[in-house]
């Protein structure tokens, strides 16, 4: 999607656009319309089932707004490291929490909180501790990104069936609990 367009247009990168939710044909048609089909290769991949790439192939493995759905175990990050060249990077940008709720979900968030959110929305400290367990990487950046409010505002103006519920959730959240997390690790 947009991250593929950015990487191709800004950096001239060749991108393997691995997606679980959008068909390769749909992505290819989009890439062709955008004039990037010569640099963007759409593929269907479920990262939890293994990746169809050679070890040491990639300079960068990047996940925007998806890693939290599948990368919440120490084993997942460890399984990705071999695909990145020594000196290359693994980078993610994901929604998260300013602090762990544990069993103390704030009252205003309880109507929206569910088991998927409990599993996938974690704090920066939680993610840093998880990534620190991995062998073969050095964490070079981990922070709360300043674009959290902008990212949510853009999402809330999108046409998607769950946006209506998310609007209510974000009104209740009021900027108190959510953040957007960036993690970058260098493969050593």
Sequence positions of predicted segments:
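Class I SAM-dependent methyltransferase SAM/SAH-binding core
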Residues: 1-49
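A short hydrophobic/small-residue beta-strand
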Residues: 15, 90-91
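A short acidic, Gly/Pro-enriched loop at the edge of an enzyme's catalytic core
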Residues: 49-61
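A short SAM/SAH-binding and catalytic strip from SAM-dependent methyltransferases
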Residues: 59-74
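A short glycine-rich, Lys/Arg-flanked "PGG" loop and its adjoining helix->strand segment in the class I
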Residues: 74-89
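Short, glycine-/aromatic-enriched active-site segment of Class I SAM-dependent methyltransferases
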Residues: 95-118
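Short alpha-helix
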Residues: 119-135
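Conserved Class I S-adenosyl-L-methionine
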Residues: 138-188
């Amino acid at each position: 999607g947009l991250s593929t367009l950015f990487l191709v247009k800004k950096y001239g990168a060749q991108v393997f656009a691995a997606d679980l939710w959008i068909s390769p044909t749909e992505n290819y048609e989009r890439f062709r319309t955008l004039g990037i089909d010569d640099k963007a290769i759409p593929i269907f991949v479920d990262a939890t089932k293994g990746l169809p790439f050679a070890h040491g192939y990639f300079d960068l493995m990047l996940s925007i707004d998806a890693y939290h759905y599948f990368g919440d175990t120490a084993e997942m990050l460890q399984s990705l490291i071999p695909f990145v060249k020594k000196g290359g990077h693994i980078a993610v940008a994901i929604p998260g929490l300013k602090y762990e709720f544990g069993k103390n979900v704030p009252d205003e968030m309880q109507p929206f909180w569910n088991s998927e959110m409990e599993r996938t929305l974690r704090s920066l400290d939680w993610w840093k501790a998880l990534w620190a367990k991995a062998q073969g990487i050095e964490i070079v950046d981990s922070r709360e990104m300043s674009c959290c409010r902008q990212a949510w505002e853009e999402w809330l103006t999108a046409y998607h069936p769950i946006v209506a519920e998310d609007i209510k959730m974000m009104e209740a959240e009021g900027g108190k609990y959510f953040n957007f997390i960036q993690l970058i690790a260098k493969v050593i």
